[in-house]
């Protein structure tokens, strides 16, 4: 598809028709076609054929009457059931208006009998024929065998898909081999490649046509717009614009497509003012066109480009989905690394203790981004979604770790080029003098491009509440870069919910960009015990049961008590301690107490310490580690 949204590039005759196998072509009512060049035709068939041709308004035996297409279509449909091996019957049915893929397949398969019935009823040469849709802007008239094969190929391609494209191309290639200068065959070949997104082939096929002085104005107009579009899809904007500069012409739908393509090429050239003028004129003339409306309202709506080399690298030449992305093509191992990143992200998420709702939200986020990218690749409408996130919750609940998981997911899906996450705080962004904050913020953002910027305690940027706080400058700078680098930057802000809400209210642009929230609840006491057990296990340590019981009581007490934070706000004591972060500190400090205890035991230096003694953390080790930790946090130390 041409653009990142639902394809509105008008292509005629793209209704949902079923592809027909060559072996099934010509079947109607379960009867198979047997094509024969010299067959004595039944007199009743000739008579009925003559009647049907008169209904088409053709001169039969030099006699003619007004056309009745409904009667002609009904008559030819009935006649095809008994004379299914006669191409002229199928041609008549197409002339009466049935140019469906099965009918065109039958015409193609019985082409060597074409003319037999026409001669019997003395039709003028080329009197019996039909118009068919090429699938892009133009209609051709079919009167001979090569026309019939071409019509079937065009109809087959209109059904879409790698199989039909390949079969249609095989038919047309055979015709071009016999008649290399036939423009109609080259046009249908170009349409097949256009539909399959083989833009470099479209350019090769149409360049001779668009420069041919002998073709009519409509043909030239259609070829010019299609060629300009193909060049734009290849990222060759300057030559594309040379064909799209004056998109008006006799083919109305091509004129609209050309004008929209021109606007998007101008946008790609960063000439948004000119692009907007073209789009406004288009919208005034076509207010119901969804693509024009979206392109006008969304400046990120643009052309998705590729290269001839990437097209040639498809594993299936007719399937755009097998085309490697930019990173995959430059680095063939990139696809494998993306799969590894997604696997790592899923593994890390599964290993998290608790946080069931957080895990669910991250899984939904992954699905949302994955399907958004698939829809974009298919040319379907994709609503503009910001991928920035709000992680709301107390310290130590896994926000930073989950941010790393999200970075892996985004990179693994191809939304970001890197899995890097740059964690920053107020001090990293704020300067002391005018102009310094903007420079520092831009430098930090530059270092985070193509990855994730994780702004912890984001509300600290405006904590003073002063109007001249440099934090407001940092926010304005961040918002501008989030817009200008929207395809290269994902920002995650983290902190307490109430504080984040106040932060988002400080600038009207913040809430519109941070629309997705993931809430991180405080851990339950039993979850923290499980975390401690697992953390110790990973360090070749083990808590004795009495130590685990000691921890459970400690965590329960902290979870049910409250303590003022540094700003005087009453918070759960466990949140002040830092939840999972507090657990890590306990594990590390308890191991230090164990080492000190063993070092001063009677067994040290005698070689009699067992592995169990070297690994076991006792309740006394825990008690001795907890007291200084709690004092350092300003929390009450429990007493027996």
From Swiss-Prot:
Keyword ATP-binding carried by entry: yes
Region forming the signal peptide: none
A Pfam family hit: T7SS_EccA1_N
Coiled coil: none
Nucleotide-binding found in the keyword field: yes
InterPro entries according to UniProt: AAA+_ATPase (IPR003593), AAA_lid_6 (IPR041627), ATPase_AAA_core (IPR003959), CbxX/CfxQ (IPR000641), CbxX/CfxQ_RuBisCO_ESX (IPR050773), P-loop_NTPase (IPR027417), T7SS_EccA (IPR023835), T7SS_EccA1-like_N (IPR049078)
List of residues binding ATP: 393-400
PANTHER family listed in its UniProt record: AAA-TYPE ATPASE FAMILY PROTEIN / ANKYRIN REPEAT FAMILY PROTEIN (PTHR43392), AAA-TYPE ATPASE FAMILY PROTEIN _ ANKYRIN REPEAT FAMILY PROTEIN (PTHR43392:SF2)
Family according to the record: Belongs to the CbxX/CfxQ family.
Role of this protein: Part of an ESX-3 / type VII specialized secretion system (T7SS), which exports several proteins. EccA3 exhibits ATPase activity and may provide energy for the export of ESX-3 substrates.
Name the record gives this protein: ESX-3 secretion system protein EccA3
Native source species: Mycobacterium leprae (strain TN)
Gene that specifies this protein: eccA3
